[in-house]
Amino acid sequence: MANIWISATMVAALAGNALPWMCLSFARISVQSPHSDAEIFALPEPIDYAEVKQRYITGSTMLFIGRVSVATMLLIAMPLLNSLSTPLGAVICLVAFLAMLLDSRQIHTLREMCVTVSAAGLGIICTGLMSVRMHPEFSIPLTMLMLCCALATIVFTHVTRRRSLFATRMADAAETLCIMMLPPLAYLAITL
């Protein structure tokens, strides 16, 4: 049963990070690029604003529902993965919630931001508390890791006021690393 939850958590976390692209492809909002001189200088075709608005609303609604579903799935799986005999379940939860939190940088609507950040923050805090309780031998390294992550987050978001290209690249690299770590961690948690 634990193997199913580990696999489902990994798939949900990976799907959660691919949701914007999936919803954009379902919304079918496209740009027609001109390929010849005649197409460049031709008058543009009229745009049906009502259809574009409806497609945007459809894609945005699907994205919101998807984010809520992924957050709910991860929050339900978190106590089950923390109760495993190996601390890899807690690491999977932390990495999945951290990837969700880093993915929230690309959210532009308030309701999606509230859902994603609050679910990721709640998941990180609850995972930390539960893993310290279930695996007390890892309490000090986990606490130090979480403090370092919190310090880095505060420095990159509040101390450097201007948008820093370095901070953006570091966050992109951290998000990519989290996504890439999920399958090997799930494999190790299943096999150990």
Where are these regions (language model features)?
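Loop-to-transmembrane alpha-helix initiation sites
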Residues: 2-13, 135-147, 170-175
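Interfacial loop-to-transmembrane junctions
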Residues: 161-180
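Transmembrane alpha-helical segments of integral membrane proteins
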Residues: 149-163
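Generic multipass alpha-helical transmembrane bundles of integral membrane proteins
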Residues: 1-115, 128-134
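Active/binding-pocket-proximal capping segment
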Residues: 117-123, 141-150
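Small-residue-rich segments of transmembrane alpha-helices in multi-pass membrane proteins
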Residues: 1, 117-131, 175-184
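Juxtamembrane boundary at the C-terminal end of a transmembrane helix
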Residues: 186-192
